[in-house]
């Protein structure tokens, strides 16, 4: 039996084309970023190369910056109502090869390949009554014109009560399996925000997609967007998906980062193997070329540290949004810090300790578990813990300055510390308190090793 959790036992780490290229990434761009990842990032656990939205549109980006998505575009589809790569942008896909040559190249580097799709069936296929593989049904018979995206006009939702609906999803994921796809980001599905009264209106399509992946015979990470995901449906997301966005598009804006602490608190009990609430891409480095104006991130170095540390201690998937070939040394060093990445891969029982207008504190356990620290067995056990404290300025979310907060945190285990150090930030252990000084918008990250002796 297919175990969807086995597809993502750890939070996926990789690169996504959207933040830099918008809709207009090409095969050459993808290969260049894959080459960079293989050489500079793969040794640290980064492995997914994901082609984001509009890869089947030969004219994608033609109207930027005025219009993001070309209206009524004639994107590329095969004879069975399935989108295929635009060969003018992905030359190796010509002749029906699809993404297989590009996926093979990414795999040859020791990496994994992913794509973005929109929920539903192409409108042009519904309008042209094109057939669906495996059944005597045409696209118009399963298309639901009353289930559409608020922001992209390419697709109709699929009416899962209609004959042929599951066959359609089975056919597209069978195609992706034949290409060698390892990761699929499905958009307009975690929150169908066109319909405020029912933001989880695509529940049946989520189930159909999960079923199609199982039937494809290939393990694929299933990532659902956009957010915010519906917390009341956490049980359903955990059953069917590997990742789901807990926020709308996250960009390099301190207000969005500050709000992420609350979002992580809401979702902290739903993190585990194969189930990763997703804080969205990391907008650092060079961004925005495909949006009409290439630029550097608006986040300060302090804010970038805060972002990465929160993502890691919460155990969000990590998807770099930058153009990798233009990473500077400081950004590369941040993304390859083994100690903060170890909390992502090895952390357990991460939880918010406290949060107020001035600061937020999270704690995670490493080699041991929260339970082993609280109620240890008779033998000694070593547990590596990470603690994060991020500061902002009270009632001034956009303020940046040297002043911050000083926290005296009851560590509870300070007297058992055999070794400990700050990865970044100023930390001191006095008696049984952990004393932390944090500048505005910055973070303190402390790793300690405890010898826990049984009662």
Regions found by a protein language model. Give the residues of each.
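C-terminal beta-strand-rich structural cap/linker in extracellular carbohydrate-active enzymes
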Residues: 430, 434-454
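Glycan-recognition surfaces
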Residues: 141-147, 155, 159-161, 167, ...
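Aromatic-lined carbohydrate-binding/catalytic grooves of carbohydrate-active enzymes
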Residues: 37-198
């Amino acid at each position: 039996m297919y175990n969807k959790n086995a597809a993502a036992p750890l939070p996926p780490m990789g690169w996504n084309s959207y933040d830099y290229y918008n809709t207009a990434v090409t095969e050459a761009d993808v290969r260049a970023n894959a080459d960079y990842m293989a050489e500079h990032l793969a040794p640290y656990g980064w492995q997914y190369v994901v082609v984001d939205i509009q890869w089947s549109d030969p004219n994608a980006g033609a109207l930027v910056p005025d219009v993001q998505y070309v209206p009524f575009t004639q994107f590329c589809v095969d004879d069975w109502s399935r989108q295929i790569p635009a060969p003018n942008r992905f030359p190796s896909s010509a002749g029906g090869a699809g993404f297989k040559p590009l996926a093979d190249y990414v795999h040859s580097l020791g990496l994994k390949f992913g794509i973005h799709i929109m929920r539903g069936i192409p409108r042009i296929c519904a309008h042209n009554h094109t057939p669906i593989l495996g059944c005597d049904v045409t696209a118009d018979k399963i298309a639901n014109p009353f289930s559409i995206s608020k922001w992209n006009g390419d697709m109709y939702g699929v009416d899962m009560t209609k004959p042929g609906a599951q066959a359609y999803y089975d056919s597209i994921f069978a195609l992706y399996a034949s290409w060698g796809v390892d990761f699929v980001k499905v958009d307009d599905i975690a929150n169908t925000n066109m319909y405020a009264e029912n933001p989880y209106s695509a529940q049946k399509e989520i189930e159909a997609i999960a079923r199609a992946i199982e039937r494809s015979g290939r393990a694929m990470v299933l990532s659902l967007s956009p957010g915010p995901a519906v917390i009341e449906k956490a049980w359903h997301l955990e059953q069917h998906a590997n990742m789901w966005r807990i926020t709308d598009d996250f960009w390099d804006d301190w207000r969005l980062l500050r709000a992420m602490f609350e979002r992580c608190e809401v979702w902290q009990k739903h993190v585990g193997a194969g189930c990763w609430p997703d804080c969205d891409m990391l907008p650092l480095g060079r961004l925005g070329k495909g949006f009409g104006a290439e630029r550097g991130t608006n986040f300060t170095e302090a804010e970038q540290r805060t972002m990465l540390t929160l993502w890691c201690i919460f155990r969000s998937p990590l998807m770099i949004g930058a153009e990798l070939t233009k990473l500077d040394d400081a950004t590369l060093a941040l993304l390859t810090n083994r100690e903060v990445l170890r909390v992502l891969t090895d952390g357990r029982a991460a939880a918010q300790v406290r949060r107020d207008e001035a600061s937020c504190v999270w704690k995670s356990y490493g080699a041991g578990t929260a339970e082993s620290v609280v109620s240890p067995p008779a033998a000694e056990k070593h547990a590596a813990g990470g603690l994060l404290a991020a500061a902002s300025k009270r009632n001034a979310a956009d303020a940046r300055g040297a002043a911050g907060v000083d926290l005296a945190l009851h560590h509870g285990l300070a007297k058992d510390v055999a070794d400990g150090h700050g990865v970044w930030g100023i930390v001191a252990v006095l008696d049984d308190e952990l004393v932390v000084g944090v500048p505005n918008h910055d973070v303190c990250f402390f790793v300690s090793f405890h010898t826990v002796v049984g009662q």
